[in-house]
């Protein structure tokens, strides 16, 4: 189900590089398809958008009424609301500090020239939120609100022909008025040519990422990260909580069939135990089919012999999310140069960050 590579020799290193390159390389068919969708939406606007939504998502309702949104939120579990409220507070506090510190960057040189960093909000931003990820909405929209972005447009696809009430609740909490039920490359094209926002942020599948790449710096503001399917790398040892390790891998695998989930360890027996935990989680997972495809296609266990190989492997993988699920994480953290976010310690899963 999940491939295993021994990193201890040149053959193993080459296998790892080949595994990573296979996923990173663009598919010309995808590029051409996305380009066709973009040009169609640019020319035919809502007519084309509705056609692609019906074709790919069986969705016939793009613009949502206030009543529909309110009715959906009414059925949201109270505990989920509490979790969103708590996450909102944490994210807001962090980014408020970020803006405060940006405004402190000032310098007056010996000639009395004043140099300073000025933070100016753009007028509008489109936020793409995959259907099951209210956290994505919070992490993208809260900074925009704090920065002073006047207009936020939310694009989120339906799952099984339904919008996630948790996403709608988070949007309401942030005062977002423009909520559109759409996904894929057609959603990015719509944000560029119909809603006409200045910039688009938020993760998505390979078609979303490719649409952002093609429009970046042309119609939309330049995007420095196209945020495709999710990536996670977990470092674990015999003292790690294996259920937590397996949960972290599966939690990213369920995002998308192209998500990448990698475990790095010195312990061969640990890989067998983690695989057993993964199978246990999958047996009760609503998104089992997606997660299973992801793990089969892009799941990997890397066996290393020493700490030097751990550092080499992680820096080669350059994961979006890295969990150092070991007690002695401090001996690794300063040597890791290529990782988006790092969760340090055995009780810091990525989902808690």
Residue ranges, per PLM feature:
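Conserved NAD(P)+-binding/catalytic subdomain of aldehyde/semialdehyde dehydrogenases
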Residues: 175-260
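Short acidic-hydrophobic, aromatic-tinged amphipathic segments that line or gate anion-handling sites
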Residues: 2-10, 178-183, 301-306
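Conserved small-residue-rich beta-alpha loop and adjacent elements
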Residues: 106-169
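A conserved active-site cap/scaffold subdomain adjacent to cofactor or substrate pockets
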Residues: 225-297, 301
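C-terminal core of ALDH-fold dehydrogenases
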Residues: 316-353
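N-terminal Rossmann-like NAD(P)+-binding subdomain of aldehyde/semialdehyde dehydrogenases
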Residues: 1-123
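Short acidic loop-to-helix transition motifs that present clustered carboxylates
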Residues: 110-111, 159-163, 182-189, 329
């Amino acid at each position: 189900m999940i491939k295993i590579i021994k990193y201890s020799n040149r053959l193993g290193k080459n296998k790892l590089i080949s595994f990573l390159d296979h996923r990173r390389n663009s598919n010309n068919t995808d590029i051409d398809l996305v380009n066709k969708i973009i040009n169609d939406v640019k020319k035919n606007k809502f007519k084309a958008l509705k056609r692609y939504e019906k074709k790919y998502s069986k969705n016939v309702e793009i613009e949502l009424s206030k009543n529909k949104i309110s009715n959906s939120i009414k059925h949201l579990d109270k505990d989920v609301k509490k979790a969103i409220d708590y996450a909102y507070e944490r994210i807001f506090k962090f980014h408020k500090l970020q803006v405060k510190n940006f405004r402190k960057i000032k310098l007056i040189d010996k000639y009395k020239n004043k140099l300073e960093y000025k933070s100016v909000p753009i007028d509008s931003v489109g936020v793409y939120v995959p259907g099951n990820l209210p956290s994505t909405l919070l992490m993208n929209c809260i900074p925009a609100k704090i920065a002073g972005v006047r207009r936020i447009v939310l694009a989120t696809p339906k799952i099984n022909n339904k919008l996630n009430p948790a996403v709608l609740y988070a949007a309401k909490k942030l005062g977002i008025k423009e909520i559109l039920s759409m996904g894929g490359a057609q959603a990015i094209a719509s944000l560029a040519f119909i809603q006409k926002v200045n910039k688009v942020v938020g993760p998505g599948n390979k078609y979303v990422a490719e649409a952002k790449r093609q429009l970046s710096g042309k119609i939309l503001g330049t995007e420095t990260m196209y945020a495709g399917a999710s990536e996670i790398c977990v470092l674990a040892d015999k003292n790690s909580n294996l259920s937590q390790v397996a949960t972290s891998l599966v939690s990213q695998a369920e995002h998308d069939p192209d998500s990448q989930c990698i475990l790095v360890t010195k312990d061969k027996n640990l890989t067998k135990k983690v695989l057993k935990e993964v199978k246990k989680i999958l047996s009760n997972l609503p998104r089992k089919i997606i997660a299973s495809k992801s793990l089969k296609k892009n799941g990997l266990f890397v066996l290393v012999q020493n700490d030097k190989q751990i550092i080499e492997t992680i820096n080669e993988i350059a994961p979006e999310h890295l969990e150092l699920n070991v007690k002695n994480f401090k001996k690794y953290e300063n040597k890791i140069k290529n990782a988006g976010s790092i969760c340090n310690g055995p009780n810091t899963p990525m989902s808690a960050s």
